[in-house]
């Protein structure tokens, strides 16, 4: 079969079937051998995907020896790079099932040969398997062999003439480092890591920085800050957007692992640079992950929060929305007084933003703000302003956003909701008589959801008459429909 997708699915299914079989060891070994000795490369490629499942299934030494030998033969197929590519893709999985010293004698040489293949598209697949091969050696209590057989492959891949191979190694570098362990990583692989961070290809630098935070766990915060962080900081000046975006993600993952001292020394300057970055995507990545810095927010408030407040007026609506989403978090960490002095006006103005998603972002945090600031404070400082926005609004979508926000607030749990529910109810009842049908049926649905949280007297005296009137006399069919639906649900 020449269609790759069909072959791949057939191999996947065959592996599942082999794993479920109780017997048939001879037939399985025979099938793999027949495919691997076929005339067409397609059969050989399929065989490569079956070796792992077949080797696990058979138990006779002769059959296993035959499979290892056949795997080696396919790895030396000089006529067909596609076959060697298939072997390279599967060498890590195969290494995971070959036992003891046979792994060293029969599979590791295959891995090393493929990692130095003339074809770069073979090498890149082989070096991606370095982590799996190293883990197999460790699992077989052969961890000392990693220094001899895996680390040299990693070092050569980092210096490979093909950027695609270096990029493949960068993608798998963290996994390989964790497999070989902290000692080898600190002594042998940190120079490789810093080399990848300085690679002249942007794809390599971006791939390397993506998992950089995992190295703190391996080598410790102090070693990482001393040996690696200078090269990470250098990427702040990178002209490539993909690198800066990857670095902004890595920055937020590094902070919790490095601790407060290193965060204030190294991460804080990065944060300030990213929040001023010309790319909205970079700014957005930082804002969406501010919760990772929550623990140290009070310590860095003077340097970071003014920049966050500036972004509340950003021309990109996604950035403004991200600021609104972060407001409750900042309030939790900085306190009610800080919110009132610095964030309240910015937060309230979001309800009048021209973009609906920004208004929604603000409304989603209202319940959380109530939990932090208290219902009485919210009733005194926030609700009157929101009411005035509703009254002054000439744009019906703003009124809808306000109704949805207040509905969530009234439907919250605890005593706070009961304190605010009367205020909310009066505005929602006004919304039910708005001149715009969309606002009216939004209010109707809000009344339906609020009804279980209201006392019976309020439902009978205010909610039910309002819904009945709308169901009977509203000129809009949608409003009538939702009113009837709401009445049915509260009976």
Where would I find each of the regions flagged by the language model?
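Hydrophobic residues within the alpha-helices of tandem HEAT/HEAT-like
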Residues: 13-20, 50-57, 90-97, 114-115, ...
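Eukaryotic acidic, Ser/Thr-rich intrinsically disordered low-complexity regions
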Residues: 464, 468-491
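Eukaryotic tandem repeat interaction scaffolds
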Residues: 357-358, 367-433
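Eukaryotic alpha-helical solenoid repeat scaffolds
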Residues: 6-9, 19-24, 42-45, 84, ...
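Alpha-helix N-cap/helix-start positions at coil->helix boundaries
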Residues: 4-5, 41-42, 80-82, 120-121, ...
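Alpha-solenoid HEAT/ARM repeat scaffold
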Residues: 8, 12, 45, 65, ...
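HEAT/HEAT-like alpha-solenoid repeats
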Residues: 1, 23-36, 61-75, 101-115, ...
């Amino acid at each position: 079969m020449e269609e790759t997708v069909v072959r791949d699915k057939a191999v996947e299914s065959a592996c599942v079937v082999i794993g479920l079989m109780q017997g048939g060891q001879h037939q399985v070994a025979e099938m793999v051998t027949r495919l691997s000795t076929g005339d067409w490369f397609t059969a050989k490629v399929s065989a490569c995907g079956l070796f792992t499942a077949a080797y696990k299934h058979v138990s006779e030494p002769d059959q296993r020896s035959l499979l290892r030998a056949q795997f080696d033969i396919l790895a030396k197929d000089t006529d067909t790079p596609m076959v060697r590519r298939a072997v390279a893709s599967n060498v890590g999985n195969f290494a995971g099932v070959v036992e003891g010293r046979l792994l060293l004698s029969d599979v590791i040489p295959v891995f090393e040969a493929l990692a130095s293949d003339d074809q770069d598209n073979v090498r890149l697949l082989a070096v991606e398997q370095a982590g799996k091969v190293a883990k197999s050696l460790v699992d077989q209590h052969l961890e000392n062999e990693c220094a001899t057989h895996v680390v040299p492959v990693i070092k050569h891949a980092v210096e490979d003439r093909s950027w695609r191979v270096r990029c493949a190694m960068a993608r798998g570098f963290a996994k390989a480092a964790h497999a070989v362990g902290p000692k080898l990583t600190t002594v042998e692989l940190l120079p490789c890591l810093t080399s990848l961070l300085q690679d002249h290809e942007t794809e390599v630098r971006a791939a390397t920085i993506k998992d950089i935070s995992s190295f703190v766990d391996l080598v410790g915060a102090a070693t990482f800050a001393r040996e690696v962080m200078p090269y990470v900081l250098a990427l702040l000046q990178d002209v490539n957007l993909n690198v800066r975006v990857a670095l902004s993600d890595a920055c937020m993952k590094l902070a919790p692992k490095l601790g407060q001292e290193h965060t204030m020394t190294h991460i804080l300057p990065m944060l300030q640079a990213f929040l001023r970055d010309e790319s909205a995507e970079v700014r957005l990545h930082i804002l969406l992950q501010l919760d990772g810095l929550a623990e140290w927010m009070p310590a860095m408030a003077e340097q970071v929060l003014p920049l966050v407040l500036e972004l509340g007026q950003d021309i990109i609506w996604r950035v403004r929305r991200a600021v609104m989403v972060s407001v409750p978090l900042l309030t939790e960490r900085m306190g009610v007084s800080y919110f009132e002095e610095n964030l309240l006006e910015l937060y309230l103005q979001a309800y009048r933003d021209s973009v609906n998603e920004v208004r929604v972002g603000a409304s989603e945090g209202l319940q959380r703000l109530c939990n932090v600031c208290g219902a009485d404070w919210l009733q005194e400082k926030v609700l009157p302003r929101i009411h005035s926005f509703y009254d002054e609004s000439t744009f019906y979508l703003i009124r809808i956003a306000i109704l949805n926000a207040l509905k969530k607030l009234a439907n919250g749990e605890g005593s706070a909701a009961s304190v605010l529910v009367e205020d909310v109810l009066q505005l929602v009842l006004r919304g039910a008589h708005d001149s715009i049908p969309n606002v009216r049926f939004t209010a109707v649905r809000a009344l339906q959801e609020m009804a279980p949280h209201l006392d019976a007297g309020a439902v009978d005296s205010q909610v039910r008459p309002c819904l009945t009137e709308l169901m009977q006399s509203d000129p809009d069919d949608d409003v009538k429909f939702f009113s009837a639906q709401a009445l049915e649900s509260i009976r």
